[in-house]
Regions:
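Short stretches within intrinsically disordered, low-complexity N-terminal or propeptide regions
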Residues: 18, 147-150, 160, 182, ...
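Lipid interaction determinants
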Residues: 19-78, 90-166, 214, 245-248
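Short, non-transmembrane alpha-helical segments in secretory-pathway proteins
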Residues: 154-195
């Protein structure tokens, strides 16, 4: 009986400790919860950016995500919802509403009521948190979290994509399937994994992280706007780059 009580107390302590690590304000490159298809969020306790997005996990299991800027004239979109720690590995999210406010902006409020499902919690280092959309397999979620650590400089990725593509905010429900076709036909990788789909800002659209399972090399795959405009409707044009290319 004493062993059972100790086990329950330890479980409660572990759950409370993990939840306390999440609480507070974090910065990220995407408005949390607006895109219900997001598979990965990278959050940081601190930022040097003058504008972007942040999320605050409040004591009473409420989260508020919003846009921040040094300019008072910017419109500020925000989402609001609830979060709940399931266990030490997972947290679930439900988005209740989306709104826009700001000087000179058309006020907008929209009830969303979207269940985002559960996300795997990964703390690779102090002040950094990855939220990985769960696949239902803990071991595989852990592997995806390790893959996600490659995405450690989202700002550089955003600049690279924007320089090549300009604005690209179209939604594509077949994105990962088209990426898989591109990897097989263009990169010609015999063994690979399309790890995660993520966003690097409101203007640059979706990016896929792909791993070559034979060499361990990671590729970023993005839709090619310029090539797509010249292609037929049945063609889907993409381009790719590696982390090494970001350093050039």
């Amino acid at each position: 009986m004493r062993h059972i009580i100790l086990t329950l107390l330890l479980g409660s302590y572990t759950l409370a400790f993990a939840q306390n690590k999440i609480k507070g304000e974090w910065y990220l490159y995407e408005l949390f919860g607006k895109k219900t298809s997001m598979e990965m969020y990278r959050l940081e306790r601190q930022t040097k950016e003058k504008r972007g997005y942040k999320i605050n996990f409040i004591e009473n299991k409420i989260f508020i995500a919003s846009y921040f800027s040094s300019s008072k004239d910017d419109c500020s979109p925000s989402t609001r919802g609830v979060y709940e720690k399931i266990n030490r590995h997972y947290v679930s999210f439900h988005v209740d509403s989306f709104s826009v406010s700001g000087i000179g902006c058309q006020m907008n409020y929209e009830g969303i009521h979207a269940d985002l499902g559960k996300f795997y919690i990964h703390f690779p280092s102090k002040g950094v948190l990855y939220l990985i959309k769960s696949t239902g397999d803990l071991d595989y979620d852990k592997q995806l979290a390790q893959d996600a650590e490659q995405i450690n400089d989202i700002n550089s990725i955003a600049k690279y994509v924007f320089k090549r593509n300009g604005e690209n905010i179209s939604y594509n429900p077949s994105f990962k399937e088209e990426v898989a076709t591109y990897v097989a036909q263009v990169l010609k990788l015999p063994h690979y994994r399309v790890c995660l789909k993520f966003s690097v800002g409101r203007y640059t659209g979706d990016v896929a992280l792909v791993k070559d399972l034979e060499t361990g090399t990671y590729f970023y795959v993005v839709k090619d706007n310029a090539a797509q405009q010249e292609a037929t409707q049945k063609e889907n044009k993409y381009f790719h780059f590696t982390s090494e290319e970001l350093k050039k």
